[in-house]
């Protein structure tokens, strides 16, 4: 059986950023044909298990599609399929591996609502999506109706260069695409990851784009929009808050040495030099706490 399609045209460096289900680009007739083509592909190689068949769809002739590859596993974006089908794909995969039959037939598969996933990357979009590394200082993940977050983030985690820069997935589901987009926008605004650069602000710019909102998307849109995006620059106030945060963390170490500036007769000021790039005052300054 097949569980519908996913739209994955929004990509950077040929890697997906935003995925959604169902696709806004397919007609019902094309949707049925592409689903059957996926089933036929699996049957042709006697494949048993959960898998993902990927197709390229013509931008000029959206009723035409071409086989690209088959991945014999679940994909990163499988949560959007779970959200609109109500099927736990991991559970089904394990059942199949254990020799059990599928728990449902094709006629029992129903697609309800719309679900969109945003991949949170440790990277700097305005620097050509260069990866970002560092130690996570604080994490706050969004909650609310229709919001699901798949991540392993925690305070103190070290983000290095050994693995893919994806650090979390934010999935928003609604009764329709507009509601799913609105919920995703709010969830991205609520997500906080301190200590590294992320693409959170970029993702918000992307899903607010008029063509994205209208469903006019293709694999070239990400590169076309990036040069015109304006990102918030850190201000002196942000740097001051960061210094306060570092100071509060330093006052609770695991050893006996406290950087509290203790002197006979009272504590001395603790000074931090903050270097930061900012549009309003690109400089460095000292702050005493």
State where each predicted segment sits.
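Catalytic cores of soluble metabolic enzymes centered on carboxylation/carboxyl-transfer
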Residues: 38, 75, 79-288
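Beta-strand scaffold of nucleotide-dependent catalytic cores
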Residues: 1-12, 64-71, 79, 130-131, ...
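ATP-dependent carboxylate/phosphate-activation module, predominantly the ATP-grasp catalytic core
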Residues: 1-37, 74-89
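Acidic-residue sensor for enzyme active/binding pockets
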Residues: 5-7, 19, 54, 69, ...
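A short, sequence-level motif marking secondary-structure junctions
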Residues: 7-8, 287-289
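Terminal amphipathic helices with adjacent charged low-complexity linkers/tails
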Residues: 6, 10, 61-67, 71, ...
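Conserved metal-phosphate-binding beta-hairpin within the catalytic cores
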Residues: 1-2, 47-75
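Short regulatory alpha-helical segment in sensory/regulatory domains of signaling proteins that mediates
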Residues: 42-46
